[in-house]
């Protein structure tokens, strides 16, 4: 069932003969899913050392992005106390 839903999510209908627009839409869907990166990475053999380095970098980047998003969400809250009352 899950593979079927993924297939439907990546199906793009060509409307009014606009093949270029459908192709752009398909590329955007594949890029957001991360498939283009996986395909280009599997095109050539990746040495185990480079794979560990890449996975470590991706883990650090993911943690950094999550923490940054948490901080930004905290700053964007509307109902928090104003730190500069007299200004």
Curated annotation (Swiss-Prot):
Keyword Ribosomal protein on entry: yes
Chief location of this protein within or outside the cell: mitochondrion
GO molecular function: structural constituent of ribosome
GO biological process, one term: mitochondrial translation
Compartments, as annotated in UniProt: Mitochondrion
Keyword Transferase on entry: no
InterPro entries linked: Ribosomal_bS21
Pfam families for this protein: Ribosomal_S21 (PF01165)
GO cellular component entries: mitochondrial inner membrane; mitochondrial small ribosomal subunit; mitochondrion
Alphabetical keyword list: Mitochondrion, Ribonucleoprotein, Ribosomal protein
Oligomeric and partner information: Component of the mitochondrial ribosome small subunit (28S) which comprises a 12S rRNA and about 30 distinct proteins.
Family: Belongs to the bacterial ribosomal protein bS21 family.
The protein's name in its UniProt record: Small ribosomal subunit protein bS21m
